[in-house]
């Protein structure tokens, strides 16, 4: 057996820190690294030197884009725990990067949601929260920026309840707020905590609860104890008997309910002012799961049956790659989470999705932007491997004798595209290489060449997403490029069913060509995708030609019906046809299939679909009229309005085509005070006047 593990599994935490853009996530992560002794100099986002944000653009934009994985160690505020390992996966908070968030949530066991005490629960927080619900990730809440004007802890707690439908349980209360924010009350210990400003909060003092807060503390402490008692009959009986629970029992009850996703313990502080992050680290250990607290990961065994791998060094090795990054020093880094078994550098692993074997070269554990070379990595841990060639995001790597494919990640389809061309001949070749690497890192980004115009087209999740790609080409690969106007990814579909024959015959001396099919083409529900059914009876079309027919249909679908955009959400059934003993071939049936689809679809009430975005605008009341008027002009459908401390919230569905340049227009409408977020919602039929204009433009 291998050497024993340095830190037992139950003392490992894999967590993410998720937040809205300005909630202070990067500063919070920074402080975590500082107190756990990783970074000696605290990085500040607004000076652009944060340790986690290691890509240059993030420093310029002050937003976090790439999820870097960082390992640190914590012994507790009072050194009260044995050594724990905390792996932090940094998740971006910007809506164009939800894919990065999905990816990191997939490999986390628990998360800390950071909220701004002033802005509260913002639209973006809701998106990320829903994603975390989907993966059943237990969470803690940290209400940050308690020192800011307008800070209000309990208002944020209520928003977590109302807007996120969660069950927040404060385990701390703030002492003062805004510039009078002094420290926090620990409701479990019933003590006030004041961090020492002289040593940047590394030490603290405990004091009695201020007189004027005792009643409030009593009220919230009771709520917390009731929440803990509800975790088991045993604790409930103790609570009913004694009217109180010991600190150990409270923590035990809260832990159980947090792991079951029944409650969200809420803490508060100001990361920037070095208050509260230390206690947050204790809470990560007290309430968030270790790899042994979460269910075994499921997957598909080599024979197609369902299998699973539990977090143990003794099980066969299995891991999931969740992030590919190009590193200027070592080349391609593949970040992966080990679910079971042990991997040593030099081992060979198998990638079942690509059907390829790879050898693991160096293994690295990342500390934000420094790296430590390690000899082995074990169940429950997160590390990066250097130089894997075939592995892409979402792939499994496993032991070749015990093959398993862990659940695949689903990535959204891009909704926006731009044409891009190199500025000089010298950039031409480099551009291809750069785009290939970036597409390998980011599955929500696609590259293809437009056959007609021979232009290179890049597609992504939003304007910002593509801007950053172009930016990275310039910085990391020294490729200068000219970027065209953004274009919308329209789709086409049909509204009624038709039956259509496609017959291809060529008789020109020697062997001819013969293919004859009848297809039934029917519309499907929006989002249902494409389905092909073979309903041939009695072999009128031999089975070996059926895949060729489907191929012909699929190729024709890519070419569109009226406007040249891909066709979606249709079912095609081949139900009749004929063949010729000598002249029939796959080629002939492929052409027949494509002819039948082309002809049939054009008679089936074809319509153009456009991407509709879910947009949320937050605006001060005085600009409300202008903002709504502008959204109506953009064919927006207002879904609802709401109040928030930051102003009015307008929920609206708007076609993507009308949203280009919206950031600039909104700034000038509201003198820079309104903000918005936008994410893809659905495809919907474009109004006929719009559709006609687009078709005309295409022809």
Swiss-Prot record:
Any one of the GO BP annotations: ribosome disassembly
Primary site of residence: cytoplasm
Annotated ranges, domain tr-type G: 10-292
UniProt GO MF annotations: GTP binding; GTPase activity; guanosine tetraphosphate binding; translation elongation factor activity
SUPFAM superfamilies in the record: EF-G C-terminal domain-like (SSF54980), P-loop containing nucleoside triphosphate hydrolases (SSF52540), Ribosomal protein S5 domain 2-like (SSF54211), Translation proteins (SSF50447)
Positions bound to GTP: 19-26, 90-94, 144-147
Location of this chain's protein in the cell: Cytoplasm
InterPro entries given in the database record: EFG_II, EFG_III, EFG_III/V, EFG_IV, EFG_V, EFG_V-like, EFTu-like_2, G_TR_CS
Gene3D superfamilies: 3.30.230.10, 3.30.70.240, Elongation Factor G (Translational Gtpase), domain 3, P-loop containing nucleotide triphosphate hydrolases, Translation factors
Top-level taxonomic group: Bacteria
Gene Ontology cellular-component terms listed: cytosol
Ranges for region Disordered: 292-312
CDD domains named among the record's database cross-references: EF-G, EFG_III, EFG_mtEFG1_IV, EFG_mtEFG_C, EFG_mtEFG_II
Keywords of the record: Cytoplasm, Elongation factor, GTP-binding, Nucleotide-binding, Protein biosynthesis
PANTHER family documented for this protein: RIBOSOME-RELEASING FACTOR 2, MITOCHONDRIAL, TRANSLATION ELONGATION FACTOR G-RELATED
Assigned protein family: Belongs to the TRAFAC class translation factor GTPase superfamily. Classic translation factor GTPase family. EF-G/EF-2 subfamily.
Purpose: Catalyzes the GTP-dependent ribosomal translocation step during translation elongation. During this step, the ribosome changes from the pre-translocational (PRE) to the post-translocational (POST) state as the newly formed A-site-bound peptidyl-tRNA and P-site-bound deacylated tRNA move to the P and E sites, respectively. Catalyzes the coordinated movement of the two tRNA molecules, the mRNA and conformational changes in the ribosome.
Record-given protein name: Elongation factor G
Organism of derivation: Coxiella burnetii (strain RSA 493 / Nine Mile phase I)
Gene: fusA
């Amino acid at each position: 057996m291998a050497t024993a593990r340095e830190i037992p599994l139950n003392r490992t935490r894999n967590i993410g820190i998720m937040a809205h853009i300005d909630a202070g996530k990067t500063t919070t992560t920074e402080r975590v690294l500082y107190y756990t002794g990783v970074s000696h100099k605290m990085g500040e986002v607004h000076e652009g030197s944060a340790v986690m944000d290691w890509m240059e653009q993030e420093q310029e934009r002050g937003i976090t884009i790439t999820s870097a994985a960082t390992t640190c160690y914590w012994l507790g505020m009072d050194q009260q725990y044995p050594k724990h390992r905390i792996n932090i996966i940094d998740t971006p908070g910007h809506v164009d990067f939800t894919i990065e968030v999905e990816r990191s949530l997939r490999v986390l066991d628990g998360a800390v949601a950071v909220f701004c005490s002033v802005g509260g629960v913002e639209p973006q927080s809701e998106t990320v929260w829903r994603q975390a619900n989907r993966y059943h990730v237990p969470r803690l809440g940290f209400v940050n920026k308690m020192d800011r004007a307008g800070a209000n802890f309990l208002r944020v707690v209520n928003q977590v309840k109302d807007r996120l439908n969660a069950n927040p349980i404060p385990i701390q209360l703030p002492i003062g707020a805004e510039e009078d924010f002094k420290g926090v009350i620990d409701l479990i210990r019933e003590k006030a905590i004041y961090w020492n400003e002289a040593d940047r909060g590394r030490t603290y003092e405990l004091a009695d609860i201020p007189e004027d807060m005792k009643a409030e503390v009593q009220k919230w402490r009771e709520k917390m104890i009731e929440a803990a008692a509800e975790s088991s009959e045993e604790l409930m009986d103790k609570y009913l008997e004694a009217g109180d629970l010991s600190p150990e029992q409270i923590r035990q009850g809260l832990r159980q309910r947090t792991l079951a996703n029944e409650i969200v313990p809420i803490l508060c502080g100001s990361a920037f002012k070095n208050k509260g992050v230390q206690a947050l680290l204790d809470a990560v250990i007290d309430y968030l799961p270790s790899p042994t607290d979460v269910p075994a990961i499921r997957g598909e065994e080599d024979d197609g049956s369902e299998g699973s791998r539990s977090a143990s060094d003794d099980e066969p090795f299995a891991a999931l790659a969740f992030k590919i990054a190009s590193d200027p020093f070592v080349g391609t880094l593949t970040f992966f989470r080990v679910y079971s078994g042990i991997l040593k550098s030099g081992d060979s692993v198998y990638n079942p999705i690509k059907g390829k074997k790879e050898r693991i070269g160096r293994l690295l554990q990342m500390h934000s932007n420094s790296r430590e070379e390690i000899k082995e990595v074990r169940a429950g841990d997160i590390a990066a491997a250097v130089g894997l060639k075939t592995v892409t995001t979402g792939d499994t790597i496993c032991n070749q004798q015990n093959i398993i494919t862990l659940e695949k990640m689903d990535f959204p389809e891009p909704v926006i595209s731009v044409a891009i061309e190199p500025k000089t001949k010298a950039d031409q070749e480099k551009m291809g290489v750069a785009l290939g690497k970036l597409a390998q890192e980011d599955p929500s980004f696609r590259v293809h060449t437009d056959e007609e115009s021979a232009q290179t087209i890049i597609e992504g999740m939003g304007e910002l997403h593509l801007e950053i790609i172009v930016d990275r080409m310039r910085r990391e690969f020294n490729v200068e490029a000219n970027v065209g106007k953004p274009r919308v990814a329209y789709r086409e579909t049909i509204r009624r069913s038709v039956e259509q024959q496609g017959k291809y015959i060529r008789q020109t001396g020697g062997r001819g060509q013969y293919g004859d099919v009848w297809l039934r083409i029917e519309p499907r529900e929006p989002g249902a995708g494409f389905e092909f059914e073979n309903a041939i009876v009695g072999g009128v079309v031999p089975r070996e030609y059926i895949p060729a027919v489907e191929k012909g249909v699929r190729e024709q679908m890519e070419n569109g019906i009226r406007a040249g955009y891909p066709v979606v959400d249709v079912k095609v059934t081949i139900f009749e046809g004929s063949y010729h003993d000598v002249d029939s071939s796959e080629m002939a049936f492929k052409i027949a299939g494509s002819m039948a689809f082309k002809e049939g679809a054009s008679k089936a009430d074809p319509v153009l679909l456009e991407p509709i975005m879910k947009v949320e605008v937050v605006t001060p009341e005085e600009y409300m009229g202008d903002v709504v008027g502008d959204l109506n002009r953009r064919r927006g459908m207002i879904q609802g309005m709401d109040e928030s401390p930051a102003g009015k919230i307008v929920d609206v569905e708007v076609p993507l085509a009308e949203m280009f340049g919206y950031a600039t227009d909104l700034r000038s409408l509201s003198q820079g005070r309104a903000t918005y977020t936008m994410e893809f919602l659905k495809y919907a039929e474009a109004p006929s006047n719009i559709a006609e204009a687009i078709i005309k433009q295409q022809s």
